[in-house]
A protein has these predicted regions:
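Bacterial N-terminal signal peptides
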Residues: 9-18
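Bacterial N-terminal signal peptides that target proteins for export
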Residues: 1-9
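Juxtamembrane cytosolic interface motif at the C-terminal end of transmembrane helices
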Residues: 20-22
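Structural detector for internal amphipathic alpha-helices that build alpha-solenoid repeat scaffolds
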Residues: 24-37, 53-68, 78, 86-103, ...
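Short coil turns that connect the paired helices of HEAT/ARM alpha-solenoid repeats
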Residues: 47-53, 80-86, 117-123, 152-158, ...
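Amphipathic alpha-helical scaffolding segments comprising HEAT/armadillo-like alpha-solenoid repeats
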Residues: 33-45, 67-80, 102-116, 138-151, ...
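Intrinsically disordered, low-complexity regions enriched in Ser/Pro/Gly/Gln/His and often acidic
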Residues: 1, 14, 34-36, 231
Length: 360
């Protein structure tokens, strides 16, 4: 059973706000959103009303019924094919939060995949891909073809970007290697005119790993090598992660480059380097001394992320114990940094820390 990750009451309020209508009262128009109190079954019946606004309001109300909404799923899925774009938006949003029984997962996944690939409205495509990510890869791997097509959608770079992000989740397979279609889509997206799409593409290639298809693998290595030697440091960082993922024996060389990026003055380059180190994990142990140096940085955001990165390395970063202890002892230390440093110390001991604090 899937229940979604969004805050259901908050989403319901958002949906209700989008479905307001005017009512006459004492000669004045009352613009306050009003949704009648009805049973869930009554709202399900309204999903078939000939008036699109009635269907829209029903989709706004149903998420308010919490975990007892599984009986509404078939009717909500049908609204994904609604001729009204606004209703399709609400249907897709509802499927991102409603309780879905195991028996309804295949049909729900297929409905969302169809919207992701075919819907004429970019907003519906985007929301459908976002909703798909609530499902486990075993349930949604069947959507890869649809996501590959969405990664080529010409009318919205955001749709292309989120499609590539979803392909990482559903295209990764540690047993058989990454899905060849997912890797090929990311390779093609490296030529996208939009920087966010190209960034999603390079990170997807880096995270997916080495393809078993020799031809695709050769294309990946060629593209990563070119980017690793290019002038864009952020893309070079992720190209290095990708190359390390292609050949573990070359990791030390690539980690050395990433460690050097921690010393750059550009904040974004530093942050990307730290994120890359967290992805590489234990093999990035040689970066620990440079991460320790960042604990003295004047930028709270850098210090905070240095703590998080050290914590992600667990026992491999144990030489950071004293510097982290010293940092925690500082007077008037910003609370999120103190909590992040405390969590990092716990991780160095192999202990699962408390939930991470919000960023400064």
């Amino acid at each position: 059973m899937r229940t979604g990750n969004w805050h259901i009451p908050l989403l319901a309020l958002m949906l209700i706000g989008a479905a307001s209508w005017a009512q006459e009262s004492g000669g004045k128009k009352d613009l306050t959103p009003k949704i009648p109190i009805k049973s869930l079954k009554s709202w399900i019946i309204d999903l078939k009303d000939k008036d699109a606004s009635v269907r829209d309001i029903a989709l706004s109300a149903i998420p308010n019924y919490g975990s007892s909404t599984s009986e509404a799923i078939p009717a909500v899925i049908d609204r994904c094919l609604d001729p009204d774009a606004g209703v399709r938006v609400k249907a897709v949003m509802a499927l991102s939060v409603l309780e879905i029984l195991d028996r309804d997962i295949p049909r729900t996944v297929d409905a969302l995949a169809k919207r992701a690939q075919e819907d004429p409205q970019a907003q519906v495509r985007y929301l459908a891909i976002n909703a798909l990510q609530r499902f486990d890869p075993v349930d949604a791997r069947r959507t890869i073809t649809a996501l590959v097509e969405a990664s080529k959608y010409p009318n919205s770079y955001e749709v292309r970007r989120i499609a590539l992000i979803a392909l990482v989740k559903f295209g990764m397979d540690k047993t058989t290697g990454p899905d060849t279609k997912a890797v090929a889509a990311a390779l093609a997206a490296l030529k996208d005119p939009a920087i966010p799409v190209r960034y999603a593409a390079i990170t997807a290639i880096a995270l997916l790993g080495k393809p078993n298809n020799p031809l695709v693998s050769a294309g990946v290595e060629k593209a990563l090598t070119e980017l690793a030697n290019g002038s864009d440091k952020i893309f070079a960082i992720w190209a290095k992660v990708g190359l390390a993922n292609q050949d573990v024996l070359s990791t030390a060389t690539h980690v050395k480059f990433i460690s050097q990026m921690l010393k750059q003055s550009d904040l974004q380059v530093k942050l990307e380097a730290m994120r890359a180190i967290s992805v590489i994990g234990a093999l990035a142990k040689p970066t620990v001394p440079d991460l320790i140096d960042l604990l003295e940085d004047k930028d709270n955001f850098v210090v905070f992320n240095a703590c998080l990165t050290l914590g992600s390395l667990n026992v491999e970063a144990r030489e950071a114990k004293d510097p982290l202890t010293k940092l925690i002892a500082k007077k008037d230390l910003y609370q999120p940094i103190k909590q992040a440093a405390t969590n990092a110390l716990e991780s160095l001991k192999g202990v699962t820390p408390k939930p991470m604090p919000k960023t400064p």
